Amino acid sequence: MTYDIAIVGGGIVGLATGRELLQRHPGLKLLIREKDDILAKQQTGHNSGVIHSGIYYKPGSLKAKLCVEGRKALWEYCDAKQIAYKNVGKLIVATEERELPNLDDLYQRGIANGIDGLEILDAAGIAEREPHCRGIKAIFSPVTGIIDYGLVARSYADDVVAMGGTIETNCEVTGIDGVGGKSIVHSNRGDVEASHVITCGGLQSDRLAQMTGGKSDPKIVPFRGDYLILKPEKRYLVKGNIYPVPDPAFPFLGVHFTPRMNGDVWLGPNAVLAFAREGYSFTTINPRDLVETLTYPGFIKLAGKFLSTGLGEMYRDVNRAAYVQSLQRYIPELTVDDTLTGPSGVRAQAMMSDGSMVDDFVFDGDAGVVHVRNAPSPAATSSLAIGRFIADDADRRFDLARSSATAVS
């Protein structure tokens, strides 16, 4: 069968994109091919479940724009679909004087990004919001929430199927070839022909882009993040999201406290190099993935720049007492005995060959293909807005309005 559009990747971004395209173009022959046995298994399935406000991102960036738009769209969607979420809020807490300039800059960034209801709290205000948290100054964001993104992704998939789209799982794409103005999408389940292709491959995004002659940069370097979980009898220590003041030189937000929809409280994550793109444990090693990372010039330069930080993260990864000590900056009464081993996730960190880490969403392509090259956090929060952004791009590149009109006539 020939499809109008084949989407490679059945995570939350690929599903949101398929949903948006079918809404705009009823009757569009659309296929989503997902390599795993279930949809949204990788980054979406290991997501911490935070609905981000948009405070962290550079004003004018795609992350800032799409996160704010996507959060509001997500609320509306979940209300309409009766998907539960909670706006539990977030504290971004400074515990030392040296963090105050970055905290103040973050507040101004939030104002510039149009985040509603931001408050500056002193130590007493922090204690009022989070009685067990200690800090000297904090930002409170009332529009930060929590949700189960697996439920959201499955709902998007239901929408795709209801509008006539096709979804294939256990379908690993192995190549994409251009033939006669169309694309042949090869997989372990056979080949299909598509007029246009959109890749939303997450941890495999660079490899998918290179299948169609895309640039080698940005390269995906996988970083694993391990969580601890508060024991049920200690959940009273945390009411909402508690985050540190991020280091602007480092792309990760630092260890934090995250309530979950099921009542759990996650602590973390750390950030250590994963030895496989889907390596959710220290012992999972994929030789191809590891060799690609260790020989990539960008990673070599990054490792030299952040050697001490990386060693500290690795030490905390194998020493729970050190891990908990980093959390005690915010909740001093927390102890190792209050924690259980939690899940892990892998972040697809896009990197350039000069060692710089890509800090914004990145999309590229040509007349027949659109690639999502970098869509880390807050992609889940932003998913509906990202879907609209990609659909806009596809409409321009693929002239879908004319194609749809021709199909109808």
What kind of feature is each model-predicted range?
Residues 16, 176-285:
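Flavin-dependent oxidoreductases
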Residues 49-125, 135, 254-255, 264-266, ...:
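Dinucleotide-binding Rossmann-like beta1-alpha1 core, especially the glycine-rich loop
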Residues 84-94, 117-120, 125-164, 182-188, ...:
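Helix-loop-beta segment of a Rossmann-like dinucleotide-binding subdomain
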Residues 297-405:
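C-terminal catalytic lobe of FAD-dependent flavoproteins
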Residues 139-196, 207, 384-395:
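Helical element adjacent to the flavin cofactor pocket in flavoenzyme catalytic cores
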Residues 112, 215-217, 234-235, 260-344:
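Flavin-binding catalytic cores
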Residues 1-13, 31:
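Beta1/beta-strand and adjacent pyrophosphate-binding region of the FAD-binding site
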Residues 22-45:
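Glycine-rich FAD pyrophosphate-binding loop
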